[in-house]
Every structure is written in C-alpha cells, then in structure tokens.
Amino acid sequence: MALSLLIAPAAAAGKQLKVIGAGMGRTGTDSLRTALNELGFKTYHMCELLGICNEGGTRAPSPLEMLGFEGGHNELWAEVNRNITAGVEPDFSFLTDEFNAAVDFPSAAFWPELLKAYPNAKVVLTVRDPHKLYKSISNAWCHIIGAGTLLDQAVTEITFNRPWGRWNRAMQIEWAKATGRLVGVPGFTWVQACNDEAYAVAAFKAWDAKVKATVPADQLLVFETGKHGYTELAAFLGVKAPTTPYPHTNSTAEFTFVLFIFRFLALLTVGVPALLACCCLRCCLRRGGAKPKTKRG
C-alpha cells in the first residue's frame, strides 16, 4: 500500500498523543517507557521497530527474529523526515492508531513536529551527564550501527540478511538528518559522533537546550535519570504514583548481551565460510604436493 503524503490534522479521529519523550536514547528512555506503561499509557519505543519490547523492559532479539527482520515502521519514519524536509506536515496516524505516548528514537528526533501535531501533549525530557551519555552510546549504539570494530561492521553489512543492513543505513541517513536539524549541525552523522566525544557532547547539549527553550514550562518535565522517579513523573502527568520502585531497564550491561548475540552471529557468518575455505585450500595444497607413486620392477 502506498504511503500517504496527505497533511494530517492535529486531532485525527480523536486519537491523541498524550506524552512525548524528547530525550536522547540511552538517557533512560526504556525505563521511561516501562514506567509510562505502568501508569496506564501505551508507549512507543525503538524496541517496537525491532519487535523486542517486553512489559518489564526490552529483551535481546532471537537469531530467528533477526533473520526475519523487516524494519518495522522504519520506512514510515523515513517518510516523516522526508516530508518535514519538503515542508509537508507529516502524518503520525500510524503512531497514534495504537499508542498514546512515544519515547526514544525514532520519535524523539521528531518531538517538535509531534508537539505541533498534538499541542496538548506533555513533554518529558530525560537527561543525563553528556559525557556519561557519550560513554553509554559508544558502548552500545556505536557497535550496532557498525561504527566500532570490523566485526561490528560485519554485523551491519553481511550478517542476518539484507533487510537489517538496509534498515541500519536508512536509520543513519534519515535519523542523522533529523538530529542535525535539531542540534543545528547540517551534515551531522552518528558515525562521527561515535568517534568524536567533543562533537557528540556538543550535540547532546544543543539538543537539551533546544527542548528547554522551545517547550512551554508547564508542559515540560526535565527528568534526571537516577535522581527522579515515579513521584515526579506521576505528579507531572496528573496520575497516581505506584508503590513499586521506578524501573531500571535496558542498561548498558543488558545492551552488551544483545551486542554479544549480534557479534556471535557475525562471527559465524564470517568465520564459518573462512574456516571452510581454509580447509578446502589445505586439502588442495596437500593433493597438489603429493608425490606420484612409482612401480617397483
């Protein structure tokens, strides 16, 4: 079915986005997703793209899931970015048809447009020390998008199947454009951010500053991960705070486990054919170097 380029009304069919997560990934966005769901919201997160959402936090994808990966809503988000670039109001109905809250990438990269479409939404800006954020991203995202070792590059280029590689490249192109637009850095790339701490930290600071300067104070909660919890979040959203502890999910350690699976599959993809090739070559060399048998007279 062709993707629609029609301008979407701000309040289509009465479906509204009630909460917009404007914080960068790795600032506690999955914990926020889990908390919002506990408070009664239905929350969109990048894990929806990957199909690895759990109520108690994201989980590692299975090899079969990665082999069948098709990219979820990625093309819809790419179209959102293209429409914004072309000056066309994006259509977020694919989001609000099922969800009433959205956090993390890719939705966080479009928080200004989401707020314009849903002006009554509350905005939660999850924040973190920018240098600690850089360390977390460099230990997690950067490996997944192939900005790390050669083995990490193999993850994005030759493991699983072609759709994963296409998704990764689309993510880097479209989401980097959206990020660059927000932080005022035309040509921004996540690969450079992964390899240049000063470049990345400047972008993180610019991102947070733009949110704080744009969103009306009565609609914005600056949520410091590790310091704030249900008390602040529930009061801001006008709901009752649960008695359970605020969740802590998708930590760097958990992300490392996902990365281990990716690297293991990459190693199988590269290592097994290489091992077979070496064995075949060795057999050929042995045969080629064998001495012919001579008859005894």
Regions found by a protein language model. Name each.
Residues 94-113, 118, 126:
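Glycine-rich phosphate-binding loop used to anchor ATP phosphates in small-molecule kinases
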